[in-house]
Swiss-Prot record:
Organism taxonomic ancestry: Bacteria, Pseudomonadati, Pseudomonadota, Betaproteobacteria, Nitrosomonadales
Protein name per the record: Nucleotide-binding protein Mfla_0145
Residues at which GTP binds: D57, T58, R59, S60
CDD domains, A to Z: ABC_ATPase
Key words of the record: ATP-binding, GTP-binding, Nucleotide-binding
Primary role: Displays ATPase and GTPase activities.
Amino acid sequence: MQLVIVTGLSGSGKSIVLKMLEDSGYYCIDNLPATLLPQASEHLSQGNHQRVAISIDTRSASLEALPGNIRKLKDEGIEVQVLFLEANVETLVKRYSETRRRHPLSSDTSTLAESISHERHMLEPLVDLGLRIDTSSLSANALRNWVKEFVTQKNGELILLFSSFGFKHGIPLDADYVFDVRCLPNPYYDPALRPQTGQDKPVCAFLEAHDSVQNMYDDIRGFIERWLPNFIADNRSYLTVAIGCTGGQHRSVYLAERLAAHFRRQEYRVLVRHRSLETN
């Protein structure tokens, strides 16, 4: 049985993800208490459900039981994948204001921002259970596409995720490492290159003509190659490397694509995401 556990902050998109998984043929359960996960998994596996998605959030009692229960399920041979969704405070406040919904931890004595902060603290032990996705600048469609690719990945070795972004949109919350490449020559100032991206050959040619770009690439690649074995030895499922330029269109995209291609050739499991391009 393949089991996808969806957790994270309220308002970060868990309902969107669960609906997408349901439309993709998963048997879905919303807001299952964490303590009931082993019993639910046993019952569902006996019922010949091959693909199951379960949402668990702060409304669930005994969240602290979740990490241990996930380890037990993996030991029993169940393929478990965990998605942790989050967003920055400004985005969550805006979403709640637009929908006029009440935060599950809200009270007469706390503000919405305080409720969000309290929930983030409660969920802190779950952050590193699987793949973190910062949905702050993601459209619903982009989130669906990210999750679709995630659930098609088989459990096993660490997955290396390269994510380009624009600093003007904010640093993504889900990054393990952030590299700032704004010091590199900027194709934006060439009118012919401005509407293109770091995936286009003219932009690649422009960047490859500068030694500083090659040096930056070599340094980032060398850093990852040096420390990646340590993350693998630590049994990490994912390592997210974020590369940022000003707008997330040219330099960061080029380097993310080039690094992803290099590590694929080394036979690592690699995903690549372009936050600003997918937002636009």
